[in-house]
């Protein structure tokens, strides 16, 4: 079975989907949700045990080796593209990885599901069919450049998604990992009150995009208002949540530790259309990925599966 996935920007479909979600936080929760709503991001320590985190590390290494391209986690000479499956900045999104047994096990860890259920105050949740993250340090065949961005449509001014990442391996200051600009979600509307050019395209059409890459001068705008990037230091089993309006990116691994993580996002089922649910079911049955969004843009993906 071969699978081809193409994206279709269809305004009639986009119009059917609710983009900005109806979610007004309470004035006070008395737990980590207060910090999340204040800063737009939060680290939830020990969402899963270190033992379970190591299990997922082992499964990710096993997944890489199953391609039989000669990769050996103990032999740095094999940490090159010719020994690895296709990826994007360390993210593995293809080959049906979104539906690997261990990937689903991570999504359904009680500590992960409970965090999203607590945030949204419902256990009727949809999960993203997203990828895994494996960053090999000191790779000489990779040119790494900063790519500050937000996974949010610039034309949508309110909250539309809370992204998540479950960390599996020790992640210190010299290890590759997530960098975010804490609190930057609060000035998202102010920044995009002016017309902004996406660094990836001069004539960028925001209408069908959930991604914006910032220029260097954009970063100065945030810095002038007191915002700065922070490299997260995470332990095995820590869960990170952030408002998709938060400016973030990742840094290249310079130490000895391989970075292991998984992107996990859950949103209330009530935010999805019937069409989105139908297409999501199709994706699940055919081992197809979606974006970080569990409830939207599912209908923007046209799938064609044929016998090879």
From Swiss-Prot:
SUPFAM superfamilies documented for this protein: Clavaminate synthase-like (SSF51197)
Pfam family, one: PhyH
Domain of life: Eukaryota
Entries under InterPro entries matching the protein: Phytyl_CoA_dOase-like (IPR008775)
Gene3D superfamilies xref list: q2cbj1_9rhob like domain (2.60.120.620)
Annotated metabolic or biological route of this protein: Secondary metabolite biosynthesis
UniProt function note: Part of the cluster that mediates the biosynthesis of a highly modified cyclo-arginine-tryptophan dipeptide (cRW). The first step of the pathway is perfornmed by the arginine-containing cyclodipeptide synthase (RCPDS) avaA that acts as the scaffold-generating enzyme and is responsible for formation of the cyclo-Arg-Trp (cRW) diketopiperazine. AvaB then acts as a multifunctional flavoenzyme that is responsible for generating the cyclo-Arg-formylkynurenine DKP, which can be deformylated by avaC. AvaB then further catalyzes an additional N-oxidation followed by cyclization and dehydration.
Record's protein name: Ava biosynthesis cluster protein O
Source species of the chain: Aspergillus versicolor
């Amino acid at each position: 079975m071969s699978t081809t996935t193409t994206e279709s920007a269809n305004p009639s479909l986009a119009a059917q989907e609710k983009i900005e979600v109806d979610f007004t936080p309470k004035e006070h929760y008395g737990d980590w949700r207060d910090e999340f709503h204040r800063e737009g991001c939060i680290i939830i320590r020990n969402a899963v045990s270190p033992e379970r985190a190591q299990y997922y590390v082992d499964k990710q290494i096993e997944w890489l080796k199953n391609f039989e391209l000669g990769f050996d986690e103990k032999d740095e000479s094999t940490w090159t593209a010719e020994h690895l499956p296709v990826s994007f900045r360390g993210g593995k999104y293809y080959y049906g990885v979104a539906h690997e047994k261990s990937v689903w096990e991570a999504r359904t860890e009680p500590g992960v599901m409970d965090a999203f259920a607590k945030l949204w105050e419902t256990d009727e949740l949809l999960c993203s069919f997203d990828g895994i993250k494996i960053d090999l340090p000191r790779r000489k065949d990779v040119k790494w450049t900063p790519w500050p961005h937000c996974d949010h449509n610039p034309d949508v001014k309110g909250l539309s998604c809370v992204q998540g990442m479950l960390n599996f391996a020790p992640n210190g200051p010299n290890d590759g990992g997530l960098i975010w600009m804490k609190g930057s979600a609060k000035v998202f509307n102010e920044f995009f009150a002016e017309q902004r050019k996406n660094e990836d395209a001069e004539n960028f059409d925001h209408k069908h995009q959930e991604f914006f890459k910032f220029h260097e001068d954009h970063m100065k705008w945030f810095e002038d208002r007191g915002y700065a990037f922070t490299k997260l230091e995470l332990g095995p089993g820590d869960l990170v949540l952030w408002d998709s309006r938060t400016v973030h990116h990742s840094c290249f691994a310079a130490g000895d530790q391989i970075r292991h993580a998984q992107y996990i996002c859950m949103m209330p089922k009530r935010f999805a259309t019937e069409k989105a649910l139908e297409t999501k079911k199709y994706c699940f049955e055919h081992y197809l990925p979606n974006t970080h969004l569990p409830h939207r843009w599912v209908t923007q993906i046209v799938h064609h599966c044929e016998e090879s």
